[in-house]
Amino acid sequence: MTIYGLIAYLIFVTSSIASPLYIPVIPPISEDKSFNSVEVLVSLFPDDQKDYTVTSQFNNYTIGTKDWTINVLSTPDGLDIPLTNITYWSRFTIGRALFKSESEDIFQKKMSILGVSIECKKPSTLLTFLTVRKMTRVFNRFPDMAYYRGDCLEAVYVTMTYKNTKTGETDYTYLSNGGLPAYYRNGVDG
């Protein structure tokens, strides 16, 4: 039995020596296939927060209220365009958080991914990965992702838009946790 183990070991060692480990290298992306404008819009229902705080550091951007927190996170060496314009507003029980940035001369030349998390402050074990409803693939980038943890909101919608302002090309991903809230499905009177 040990002879078979020795043969398997020799095959493994010789095949490892003959074919060194292959690590693919992703070449830089050309300027016409890269973007220089990023926008992440998060819509929440029902929501009527008035006070919020904004925090940003190391490709992690956060808007927080007394009920929930929204994080937009990029890979550690990912997004070259920092999301500098971060705002929140609420109207008709729908809250919107906008993370945005645009640059004239900085283009995203390497593969990147954006992740969005919406988390209720009240502890909960409910975790929902938002479903991709629509997505275009113009630029070379990894697919976006988003999740919602908690039960303080009925509906969560996330739209991520990427644009090359020189060519006008636009790429976007639309994610949500479901259809319309029951309030709209059943009508105002129920």
UniProtKB/Swiss-Prot annotation:
Signal peptide: none annotated. InterPro entries: Orthopox_C13 (IPR009172), Poxvirus_TNF-rcpt-II_C (IPR010806). Gene3D superfamilies: 2.60.240.20. Transmembrane segments: none annotated. Belongs to the orthopoxvirus OPG209 protein family. This is Protein OPG209. It comes from Monkeypox virus. The gene is OPG209.
